[in-house]
A protein has these predicted regions:
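SAM-dependent methyltransferase catalytic region
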Residues: 1-249
């Protein structure tokens, strides 16, 4: 899903899978005790064609989602994560429904489920908690920092809620009674990613996954950053930390 390939026509196979993932990301996402060396011992017991097909299918699903308007794309991308399973009890990938429950209850924004939080809504509904919701989502210059993103689903929720408010502004300013064209919606989305959403990740793969969730395979700036020795960087090199976060490098 998140792997960065030099040639996107290349397949992810049992033979190159471990090479595509840095050691820290492997340790973070794989079940405890399953080293790269141990994984190689498992290879004869996997179906190589099935492994390759599943990897390609996930990436194709993202490419299909990239053709949709932002609201529909959020639904499609979040649905992909419903196919994933937690690697082990120490590495929990928070489900999209729980993200909606958590953030919707705390600060509001656009929730993609009904009031019972059981069924996905046709269109997201806005939850307004007053001052905190206004400060986070209705301030057009808001800057939102997500710390320790693994999947990008939390910043996806935040980005959509900021995007939806800016889309309303565009519609009002242009006095549109119809839907805003998808290309303009996408440009608003890209601007939100560039100007309003900032993400810190614990590993390189978490950064790649988060970027894939937010922008897919499209060329858009995402301010996602992986830092080694994060506490030291914040404490002793704060100016450099802020610049790198803003640059998304």
């Amino acid at each position: 899903y998140g792997a960065e390939l030099n040639d996107e026509n290349q397949d992810i196979t049992l033979d190159n899978f471990a090479e595509l993932i840095d050691n820290q990301s492997w340790e973070e996402f794989m079940p405890r005790g399953v080293t790269k060396e141990l994984f190689k011992e498992f290879i004869p017991y996997y179906d190589p064609d099935m492994f390759r097909a599943v990897g390609r299918n996930y990436r194709d699903l993202v490419r299909q989602a990239d053709q949709l308007a932002p609201m529909e794309r959020v639904k499609a991308v979040s649905r992909i994560f419903s196919y994933f399973r937690n690697p082990d009890k120490e590495t929990v990938l928070t489900p999209w429904r729980v993200v909606n429950m958590h953030i919707g209850d705390c600060i509001g924004g656009y929730v993609f489920f009904d009031e019972a939080m059981e069924t996905e809504s046709v269109a997201p509904r806005f939850i307004d908690h007053g001052e905190v919701t206004d400060a986070v989502f209705k301030d057009r210059n808001t800057r939102i920092l997500e710390i320790n993103s693994k999947t990008g689903l939390y910043p996806l929720y935040m980005a959509y809620s900021v995007f939806a408010e800016k889309l309303k502004d565009y519609r009002d300013n242009h006095m549109l009674a119809t839907d805003v064209p998808v290309d303009i919606q996408n440009q608003i989305w890209y601007n939100v990613l560039k100007d309003n959403i900032f993400v810190i990740c614990k590993t390189e793969m978490a950064k790649s996954i988060t970027k894939r969730t937010l922008r897919g395979f499209r060329r858009a700036k995402v301010n996602a950053r992986y830092f080694e020795d994060l506490i030291n960087k914040i404490t002793n090199q704060s100016d450099m930390f802020i610049k790198k976060m803003h640059d998304g490098k």
